[in-house]
Design a protein with these regions (language model features):
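Alpha/beta enzyme core
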Residues: 3-11, 15, 27-52, 57-76, ...
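Short catalytic-loop micro-motif centered on adjacent basic/acidic residues
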Residues: 19-23, 81-82, 103, 204-207, ...
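Metal-dependent phosphohydrolase cores
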Residues: 21, 213, 259
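Hydrophobic alpha-helical scaffolding
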Residues: 23, 151, 228, 232, ...
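Glycine-rich nucleotide/cofactor/substrate-binding loop typically near the N-terminus or early
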Residues: 81-83, 240, 249
Length: 289
């Protein structure tokens, strides 16, 4: 059964570890992430961008697939299904479809409008027992068609959004989606620390987890980050393993062209990547505590 992300993130914040949000794109992605979480006894958040939701034919399809897998695979760790970088309209669609968590990305609105819309969605989400994430300061790079520069959020604006009753807060601290350029200046821990001082127990979210050095990830967790989003690294691992299978001519051997065989190395690579991240974030074994 899907759960809100609230309890798992509050526990993570108090226990100084982070729960991974791993974005799903299809059946293989979903299965690999769920199996990795079950194997490591870690809570997990399945992220769905609006683009991925559309690709999978709609949010109801996603909910049906995820709920079916939780049952068929006997998944016993806490799993939240979360809309990633949701538009105002997208949030309502996911609430209706049966998601257990949403993110409203109002970072491109003026702060007053962002606050107004967030306030409204907080009320609706809470009424349905769902968790809700808000964002202040855009995250750089591109995610599901949403493009951001990678700025640092204003800690005071973060506090005003946190005070609206959101479950978790994503704040730009110089992080970007996708691969980090060589001239990237790194995360602004000064900004993160200032945000944590003002937002207290609020679980903070780090978007663009791919390519951030491990020591920076650990430092971010020590400064209140309780949810870390990973997408690009899983995509790269999948692509590399699939390319190797084809380049090695495996698809030409026997029934190697069968999609179940052709996609298996990529699915295994995703699972391995998720296990590595779960261990790095410190959430291994936390489902049983």
């Amino acid at each position: 059964m899907l759960v809100s992300a609230k309890e798992m993130l509050n526990k993570a914040k108090a226990g100084h570890y982070a729960v991974g949000q791993f974005n799903i794109n299809n059946l293989e992605w979903t299965k690999s992430i769920l199996l990795a979480a079950e194997e490591t006894r870690s809570p997990v958040i399945l992220g769905v961008s609006e683009g991925a939701g559309k690709y999978m034919t709609g949010y109801k399809t996603v909910v049906g697939m995820v709920n079916g897998m939780l049952e068929e695979l006997n998944i016993s760790v806490p799993v939240a299904l979360h809309l990633d970088h949701g538009s105002y309209e997208g949030c309502y669609k996911c609430i209706e479809a049966g998601f257990s968590s949403i993110m409203f990305d109002g970072s491109h609105y003026p702060i007053e409008e962002n606050i107004e819309k967030t306030k409204e969605l907080v009320k609706v989400a809470k009424g349905k027992g769902m968790s809700i994430e808000a964002e202040v300061g855009s995250i750089g790079g591109e995610e599901g068609g949403v493009i951001g520069r990678g700025e640092c959020a204003d800690p005071k604006e973060c506090k005003s959004v946190a005070d609206l009753g959101v479950t978790m807060l994503a704040a730009g601290i110089g992080n970007i989606h996708g691969k980090y350029p060589e001239n990237w200046e790194g995360l602004s821990f000064e900004t993160l620390d200032a945000i944590q001082q003002l937002t207290g127990d609020m679980p903070l979210v780090l978007h663009g987890g791919t390519g951030i050095p491990d020591d920076m990830i650990k430092k971010a967790i020590s400064l209140g980050v309780a949810k870390i989003n990973v997408n690009t690294e899983c995509q790269i691992a999948f692509a590399e393993a699939t390319r190797k299978y084809i380049e090695d001519g495996k698809d030409l051997e026997g029934k190697g062209f069968d999609p179940r065989k052709l996609l298996a190395p990529g699915a295994e690579a995703i699972k391995d990547m998720v296990i590595t991240k779960i261990k790095l974030f410190g959430s291994e074994g936390k489902a049983d505590e």
